[in-house]
Amino acid sequence: VLHYGQLDARLLLRVGGSMGDVYGQKVLKRDLNGYILNEEGVGLALENKETHLGSILPKMNMGWNLGFGYKGINLGMTFTGRFGGIVLSETQSVLNAAGVSKISADVRDAGGVPINQAKIDVRNYFQTIQTASVYYTYSATNVRLGELSLSYTLPKKWFANKLGMTVGLVGKNLWMIYCKAPFDPELTTSAASNFYQGFDAYMLPSTRNFGFNVKFQF
């Protein structure tokens, strides 16, 4: 059993299941008609109900490399994609409960969280569901421009045919084309276990990287 911070998610390996299956333990309490309970003087409440959230493992990883060359100029692009799987965000749950996230601001501006054809207090809602991982589970599917490189090989005649020289620029993680999670699904909280892949616990955002290179040929 592997726990995910303050969220109630647990990674469990069960008969008939698969490696990487994650289960949530609580959901908002509902009445017999399926409506979320919001009792006067009590407000919202959670109840125990184990829910299969999905697997942290992707169904497929893909990469696509493109290269173009013309008169010493070379352009290379690498697109990468991860399809399937889930990620969880403790960071988002804490920000929502504190009322400092964009989503909490949006629903506050809209007059409250819509539940049962009515709107309820934003603070009450987000503080109630703060530890319920079922509300902080996202698709891990993402597609990005992983690398872009541009290089130019200078004509050897510039160096009396005694030297070859190529200069280039390279950028990595430049463009997130598709991602529904509130953080980069490829980041990981812990290097000690691959099962923490895609668990966001106050991580720094991913960054773009730029580089310059020079290659000589004698």
Region spans (language model):
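Membrane-embedded beta-strand positions in outer-membrane beta-barrel channels/transporters
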Residues: 63-65, 147-151, 211-213
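Conserved small-residue
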Residues: 1-56, 172, 176-182
